[in-house]
């Protein structure tokens, strides 16, 4: 709409250019500098440069490296788009095995060997450089026999580690997620989320345990059609939200002690809509009632 009153492509248009192989080699978003992209013979992005990088005296470029299976293995900055001279590695990725444990940052007891072979074909580790410093974040991923992430171990900037372990249900949904946080010179903290499901695999309850104390974060109830009927927060009836639907299962209302909302489609104050679009809505917080007809 703004372009119609002020025909300025740089401010109001999304612009793209392509090469002979139909690859996007240049793009410009409204109000931003243009981005250049360079590809290799396998059509993989190998260099890119945005307006901020172009403004630097060194003319930085982002570079990308891949393995034989076209998986990203390294990315960072360099000073030209012909060779990776002046390289500053920002992110590295490792796949298939845990041979990375011999490298600095991974060669300690917090990162375990895994001889199960479950990591074959999957991302097993990554190293990320903290911008503006020489610090790095080391992360390892461990998988179960079904290829699901069972454990993640990550170093943190406080001299410790964050370990996340997930146990799954038979249908591949998380049953428990345990997060252990360690910091140099301070006690270890452990928290656990527990998820309960009904016979149809719909989420029924989320519980949180910290310091041995378990609380209920949310309870969910469903109607006979599987639609969310109510949600109670922190096990309290006063923090309960109920949901209403029409015969087409379009959401028509949310009601609770602190917030109420009604949605209108082919009725209400707005122009009637019969395609599922909302024509108007009303919502109430406390004693104040607001009305908002749809702009369309």
Predicted regions and their residues:
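Extracellular/periplasmic, surface-exposed regions of secreted and cell-surface proteins
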Residues: 208, 220, 224-233, 238-260, ...
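Beta-turn initiation residues at beta-strand->coil junctions
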Residues: 1-6, 20, 26-32, 47-53, ...
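Hydrophobic or amphipathic alpha-helical targeting/insertion segments
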Residues: 60-80
